Amino acid sequence: MASSSKAKSAFSQPFLFLYQLLQWLLHKALSPQPPPANGTGRRPRVAVIGAGITGVTAASHICGHGFEAVIFEAGPEEQLGGIWSRVNDTSGLQIHSVMYRFHPSVLWQQGYPDRAQIVTEVRRLWARYGLQDKTRFNTRVERVYQDAGGTWIVNGPTHGRFDGVIVAVGTCGEAKMPPLAGMEDFVGPVVHSSELSARHVDVTGKQVAIVGGGASAVEALEFAMANKAAQVTVLSRSEKWIIPRDAVVDALLSLNIFGRETSLSWIPEWLLRHFFYGPELEELSPPSNKGFFTDTPMVNSDIMVCLRDGRARWLRGDIEMLTENAVIVNRRARGVPKNGPGHHETVTADVVVMATGFHRPSLAMLPDDCFVEPYQCPNWYLQTFPPQHPSLSAINCTFVNAVGSVGNWHIGIYTRILLMFLIDPLTRPSPVWMRRWVDMTRFLKRGAPTAAFDFFTYLELVAWFVFCVCVNPFRWKWAIFVFFGVGLSWPRAFVRREERLLNSQGYRLRDLGSSF
C-alpha cells in the first residue's frame, strides 16, 4: 500500500512533471549555497542535537548561510534520518510530499514517497552541505549549560563553545511496548509496529491483531495488507479522526488560523462523516463532542477501502488480555470513555502487532530554568524558545497535537529566527516579552477544549511567525531572510551600521535575553 520508491516517468504524467519543475525552481531560487569544502563557518556557532530530518535540515541552513554547526547524534550513522531510519520498508508519507518539503533542495520523485526515498533525501542533504565532518555520532547529549560568558557548552568543553543551540530530538524515541496480561501465553509473535520489517515477521495468510489506533496502527495495517494478510483487526482505545490522503483536503483543514474549535468547525466534521466515512462507516467517526481541531488526525484513504471490502476491521475498546491464539477486548460503543462499560469480544489472531507508539525523548539535558511554571514546554515563545533563553530553540520536539506537517519549511524559518536573534541584538526578545506572548496566545485561545499550545494548525503557526517579525521594527529588515532564506547581506549591513551608530558597548547592553 505504501508507494513504490521507483518513480514513474514524469513526462508521462503532466501534473507530476509540473510538480517536479516547481521543486526545481524552488531549489534554484531558495536553496542556500553549500559551503566550500573544508571551509570553516563564521560565528555564530550553533549546536544541533539530533540527526533526524529536523536536525539535518537546521544544520544545512546554518552552514548554507555561512555559519558553523555541529550535530550531536546519540546513535550510529545508520540512524541518520531519525525515526525514518528505523521504520518498516513499507512505510511512507501519509501526507502529500508538497507538505513535507523540509528543505528547498529536496526533490521528490513522486507525491507520496516511501521510506527509502525519504532517507535518501536526508542523506543527500547531509552530504550536499558538508555535514559529514560536522556530525558527532554515538554522542548522547546529557547536559547543555552556559559558562560565565553566556556561551553554551554541550556535555563538556571538549566540543568547544556555542552561541546557540537547536534541540531536534523529535517526538519519537524508543519503541513503547506496554505489557499485556497473558502476553507470555500467546503462541504467535508479539512485535512492535516499527520492527515488522527488521524482524521479518510473516503475516501472509494470517490473522493480524493491531493494538493501537494512531499513525503506528496505519503503518502496521499497510505492512499487513502489502504482505497479504488474511484478516486485519485494529483494536483502538482512542477516538481519532481519519482524513483523506488528499493534498487539497489536507491543506484546507490546516487553514484554520485560530488553531482551535470554532463555531464553523462542524462543517469539516459533517463533510468528513458524510462523504469520507459514509453511512456504512459513520459509526467509526469520533462522537460529536470530539471536535476535529483538538487532536492530530490520521491521514489515510486506503484504510477506508480495506474496511469497506472486509479485509480489515476497526474495533473500539480496551485490551483485557491475550490468550493462546486470541486477544480479549472490552468493546465499547462510540463516545464511551477508555475503560468504560462495554462487552467482551474475542479476536482470533496469529500475530499481534503493538502499534503503541514511541516514548517522547526527554529534554532534561536543558537548564532547569527552561521548565519554570507556568512556562514549561510547550508553553514557550513560538512554542520552541524557552523564555529565559532566546538563543535556544527546540524545533519539532515540543508540540503535542497539530494539523499540518512536522517536515515542512517551518524548520528553516525557526532556524533563521534563531540566527536573527544571534546576529542582531536589537531583535532579541526579553524574557518578559516572551512570556507576554505566551500569555497573549493563551488569552486568544481561552475557552478552547484543549490547552492553548496542545493543539495548533499550520496557518496558526505561520501567523505566529508573521507576528514575531512585525511586532519589532528592528526585525523588519530581516523579514525576507526569515521567510525565504535569501538576502542575508542586506540585514547584516544594517546591523553593522546600527552598531557603529549606537556604539558597540551600548549595542550589546540592549540584549535583554539572559542567554547572551
Residue map of PLM features:
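Short hydrophobic core segments
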Residues: 49, 160-173, 208-211, 346-359
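C-terminal, flexible cofactor-proximal segment of oxidoreductases
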Residues: 2-32, 382-383, 390-516
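C-terminal catalytic lobe of FAD-dependent flavoproteins
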Residues: 284-370, 449-516
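Short, conserved active-site loop motifs that form the nucleotide-linked donor/cofactor pocket
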Residues: 133-135, 188-189, 311-313, 392
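Rossmann-like dinucleotide-binding core of oxidoreductases
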Residues: 20, 33-41, 53, 58, ...
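FAD-site-proximal beta/loop scaffold in flavoenzymes
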Residues: 189, 193-199, 325-328, 344-345, ...
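Feature captures the FAD/FMN-dependent oxidoreductase FAD-binding
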Residues: 111-173, 307, 321-326
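Beta1-alpha1 glycine-rich phosphate/pyrophosphate-binding loop at the start
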Residues: 3-16, 48-133, 230-231, 236-247, ...
